[in-house]
């Protein structure tokens, strides 16, 4: 509880399994009556070149399971309640890598690109029932997920607080997409000069 009357409730869930997602969704519906806002932020990242992944197909399956199917299953479990109330907002945390086609992140970027595409379709389908969808193409954030990659010690990153500010902006203003200047530059460069972009990356 806080001085403004808000109450924070936490609940642990395994979003890497369908059973875990279903249990979490059922808990949200039972305890909270559904959700007005859903932020799909759980995910995993794998940095490995495609040539080094020929015998690691499971990396793609595991990454898709939580980054795409987990978010999709949670969203579809809560959408009926949002539709019944004719209001709701789904914020899907994607990656700057989708805009820049980051090499050696094919499993991760593909999973986030799939979520981006689904979000765009859902936004069109639910536009007339008061449900909004926002994609946040998040840059690198200084979290334990990127710690094993020493290269990122010299790359611009956001603090967790700055990343949180982007999510708050998504909740308040409900844009279709939030992307940083670097992400937008990468997307434009790949669109206008793809060969140059590939060399630069």
Q: Which residues make up each language-model segment?
A:
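Active-site helix of classical SDR
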Residues: 75, 111
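The beta1-alpha1 cofactor-binding region of Rossmann-like NAD(H)/NADP(H)-dependent oxidoreductases
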Residues: 12-23, 57
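C-terminal helical subdomain
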Residues: 135, 152-187, 191
């Amino acid at each position: 509880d806080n001085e403004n009357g808000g109450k924070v409730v936490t609940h642990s869930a395994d979003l890497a399994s369908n059973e875990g997602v279903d249990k979490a969704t059922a808990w949200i519906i039972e305890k909270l009556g559904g959700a007005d806002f859903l932020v799909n932020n759980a995910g995993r990242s794998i940095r490995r070149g495609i040539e080094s992944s020929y015998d690691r197909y499971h990396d793609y399956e595991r990454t898709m399971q939580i980054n795409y199917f987990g978010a999709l299953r949670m969203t579809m479990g809560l959408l009926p309640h949002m539709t019944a109330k004719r209001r709701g907002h789904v914020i899907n945390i994607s990656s700057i890598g989708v805009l820049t086609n980051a090499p050696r992140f094919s499993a991760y970027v593909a999973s986030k690109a799939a979520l981006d595409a689904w979000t765009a379709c859902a936004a069109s389908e639910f536009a007339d029932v008061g449900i909004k969808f926002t994609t946040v193409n998040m840059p690198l954030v200084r979290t334990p997920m990127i710690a094993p990659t020493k290269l990122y010690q010299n790359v611009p990153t956001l603090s967790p607080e700055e990343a949180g500010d982007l999510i708050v902006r998504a909740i308040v203003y409900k844009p279709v997409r939030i992307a940083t200047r670097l992400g937008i530059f990468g997307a434009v460069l790949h669109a206008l000069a793809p060969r140059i972009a590939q060399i630069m990356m």
